[in-house]
Amino acid sequence: MDGWRRMPRWGLLLLLWGSCTFGLPTDTTTFKRIFLKRMPSIRESLKERGVDMARLGPEWSQPMKRLTLGNTTSSVILTNYMDTQYYGEIGIGTPPQTFKVVFDTGSSNVWVPSSKCSRLYTACVYHKLFDASDSSSYKHNGTELTLRYSTGTVSGFLSQDIITVGGITVTQMFGEVTEMPALPFMLAEFDGVVGMGFIEQAIGRVTPIFDNIISQGVLKEDVFSFYYNRDSENSQSLGGQIVLGGSDPQHYEGNFHYINLIKTGVWQIQMKGVSVGSSTLLCEDGCLALVDTGASYISGSTSSIEKLMEALGAKKRLFDYVVKCNEGPTLPDISFHLGGKEYTLTSADYVFQESYSSKKLCTLAIHAMDIPPPTGPTWALGATFIRKFYTEFDRRNNRIGFALAR
């Protein structure tokens, strides 16, 4: 493969850097770490099982969902989690019940499957379930919660309990899910989701978990940062890590370059162009870009991605764009113009060979995704981008910082 990445069949294992499940117990004065594992995405799992993605229909690639709480409904852009590849662990209750979760800057609520989920829902059988009767700190709320995904409805009710994340304990309102569609969640290696977004995105305006952590005053800074390991060949490597309260200089080099958010309430910034090689091809007049840790790929509007793929010579195959693998190393660089600086991805960063696919075709980690107003139209910079650029989310100053990952 001439040094460029191969998508692993099964994800990276956690490198054990201490005895604590949720963080380093000795790290009490600076910041807290959450170690991440890498997993096969739901889409990868479906392909490995020979599922014809075309038969599932286009709704499987759509990003728009509606969230409902009680009698209130609001449109919120959420990752569909079909391509999510990284998860960490949290504990809920006293004593803690451990769950694998996606940490998602594109949403703001916490939810996990509930022991009250009927075994008729196969997805619940395959996941860890929260049992309120086993927690001495549990408090009942009961407000109905529904997340309407394009692939099915996830619903349940709100509860309150102590959540342990990165060695920090916080009293948190979260969703206990009692109804989950078998597809896609039966194939997900993660149990639930921890939203790292703003309260403006939270259904029912439930205070997000990071806001509650900030209010405790236990962090050095009101920031959190993401590192995704690019060493996908080494199964013993750390899949990645989240740092609460700062950034880890072991995983980036140089200084951070900061870009202010478009507005408070969403992790979205201004982009001034997308270049292929030396030519600015897209977004010449400016556009928006979400920085989305819940997504694996980079995405843009259908019209933008079609133009980009034409320039790259890529062909569409179901929901993916592919090239001949021997052409991959010759593809041009793609640069994203953010805050007066170009962030460049080489073909090694955005082309990969799927272990279950023909060796003659390789997939581009770039997808089309049409996000409607008011958040869209917008690009979304997911793990494809974050693997190359260590990313810091600064709540105090409403900005995002990037530094070259190492």
Swiss-Prot record:
PROSITE patterns: ASP_PROTEASE (PS00141), PEPTIDASE_A1 (PS51767). The keyword Ribosomal protein does not apply. Residues 86-403 form the Peptidase A1 domain. It catalyses: Cleavage of Leu-|-Xaa bond in angiotensinogen to generate angiotensin I. GO terms for molecular function: aspartic-type endopeptidase activity; insulin-like growth factor receptor binding; peptidase activity; signaling receptor binding. The active site is at D104, D292. Keywords: Aspartyl protease, Cleavage on pair of basic residues, Disease variant, Disulfide bond, Glycoprotein, Hydrolase, Membrane, Protease, Secreted, Signal, Zymogen. Its EC number is 3.4.23.15. Its main location: secreted. Glycans are attached at N71, N141. It holds the Pfam family Asp. Disulfide bonds join C117-C124, C283-C287, C325-C362. Residues 1-23 form the signal peptide. Residues 24-66 form a propeptide. GO terms for cellular component: apical part of cell; extracellular region; extracellular space; plasma membrane. GO terms for biological process: amyloid-beta metabolic process; angiotensin maturation; cell maturation; cellular response to xenobiotic stimulus; drinking behavior; hormone-mediated signaling pathway; juxtaglomerular apparatus development; kidney development. Interaction with ATP6AP2 results in a 5-fold increased efficiency in angiotensinogen processing. It is found in: Secreted; Membrane. Belongs to the peptidase A1 family. It is linked to Renal tubular dysgenesis: Autosomal recessive severe disorder of renal tubular development characterized by persistent fetal anuria and perinatal death, probably due to pulmonary hypoplasia from early-onset oligohydramnios (the Potter phenotype). Renin is a highly specific endopeptidase, whose only known function is to generate angiotensin I from angiotensinogen in the plasma, initiating a cascade of reactions that produce an elevation of blood pressure and increased sodium retention by the kidney. Interacts with ATP6AP2. This is Renin. The gene is REN.
